[in-house]
Amino acid sequence: MANIHQENEEMEQPLQNGQEDRPVGGGEGHQPAANNNNHNHNHNHNHNHNHNHHRRGQARRLAPNFRWAIPNRQMNDGLGGDGDDMEMFMEEMREIRRKLRELQLRNCLRILMGELSNHHDHHDEFCLMP
């Protein structure tokens, strides 16, 4: 009987380590190997507890973001509307991007034209290059 019990214990051990260590961080639910029988007995209890704890942890992690976002929105509404500000901002960004793109294109053309005009004497060589 003892051997069979030990084999089961060894088979379950990796699962317990994988599932329970992550949410709790090696503290609760990760008992020393000396308490093998207790550990096995408490496995379901610990696992359920940790599962709920993990979910609660995720919710708590998300909450500050919501709390942070809501007051800002209220402030912006008071100042003249959240949506308008965002739309203005997006339009400005789009215009800036458009200007940047135009500048880049102009620079590229200028460089190309500059190269062509610089190499005007070697125009045939320039064209022959693959």
Swiss-Prot record:
Residues 119-123 are annotated as: His cluster. GO terms for cellular component: cytoplasm; cytosol; nucleus. GO terms for molecular function: death receptor binding; identical protein binding; metal ion binding; molecular function inhibitor activity; nerve growth factor receptor binding; signaling receptor binding. In cochlea, it is expressed in pillar cells from postnatal day 2 to adulthood. Residues 1-62 are annotated as: Disordered. Residues 87-112 are annotated as: Interaction with p75NTR/NGFR. Residues 87-130 are annotated as: Interaction with 14-3-3 epsilon. It comes from the Eukaryota. Induction: In neurons degenerating after kainate-induced seizures, likely in a zinc-dependent manner. Residues 40-59 have a biased composition (Basic residues). Pfam families: BEX (PF04538). A motif (Nuclear export signal) lies at residues 96-106. Zn(2+) binds at residue 127. It is found in: Nucleus; Cytoplasm, Cytosol. One of its GO terms (biological process) is signal transduction. May be a signaling adapter molecule involved in NGFR/p75NTR-mediated apoptosis induced by NGF. Plays a role in zinc-triggered neuronal death. In absence of reductive stress, acts as a pseudosubstrate for the CRL2(FEM1B) complex: associates with FEM1B via zinc, thereby preventing association between FEM1B and its substrates. PANTHER family: PROTEIN BEX1-RELATED (PTHR19430), PROTEIN BEX3 (PTHR19430:SF1). Self-associates. Binds to the DEATH domain of p75NTR/NGFR. Interacts with 14-3-3 epsilon (YWHAE). Interacts with DIABLO/SMAC. The nuclear export signal is required for export from the nucleus and the interactions with itself and NGFR/p75NTR. This is Protein BEX3.
